[in-house]
Amino acid sequence: MIVKYIKGDIVALFAEGKNIAHGCNCFHTMGSGVAGQLTKAFPKILEADKLQTEWGDVTKLGSYSVYEKYFRTHKAYCFNLYTQFQPGPNFEYSALMNCMLELNEFGENKLIKPTIYMPRIGAGIGKGNWDIIEGILDTYSSKLEIVIVDWEPLL
């Protein structure tokens, strides 16, 4: 469930050790938007996508791959949510629903709900309607605390 909206830099939040999730396509293409920013800063995010999934595999739509970054006291997760099959304005609401059902399992059996930071997933390059996306996130993430990050550069 969405617990708050903040202004910030999701790349910096991941570098600080926060769990994040972002939308991507099924063709190992993370060259623009939030995915592009993340893979430029953390190339292993794209490497995890390529190692854990097949290029152009339609069956990964609605699932995710994950990159684990280790810190001294914990590990942070970057979830690559397959919210659209092809790059561009091709966001699929049903894929997000399935991604969130799977991601929600990450929060099962945890004493404290995990916090996941996300951009306005699917509403940028994917051209999804944020009002619908927001409803999906709230409905399918009862075991998570989601923080939506509206991009604002660090000064």
From Swiss-Prot:
<feature type="domain" description="Macro">
    <location>
        <begin position="1"/>
        <end position="155"/>
    </location>
</feature>
<protein>
    <recommendedName>
        <fullName>Uncharacterized 17.5 kDa protein in tk-vs intergenic region</fullName>
    </recommendedName>
</protein>
<dbReference type="InterPro" id="IPR043472">
    <property type="entry name" value="Macro_dom-like"/>
</dbReference>
<dbReference type="GO" id="GO:0140291">
    <property type="term" value="P:peptidyl-glutamate ADP-deribosylation"/>
</dbReference>
<dbReference type="InterPro" id="IPR002589">
    <property type="entry name" value="Macro_dom"/>
</dbReference>
<dbReference type="InterPro" id="IPR050892">
    <property type="entry name" value="ADP-ribose_metab_enzymes"/>
</dbReference>
<dbReference type="Pfam" id="PF01661">
    <property type="entry name" value="Macro"/>
</dbReference>
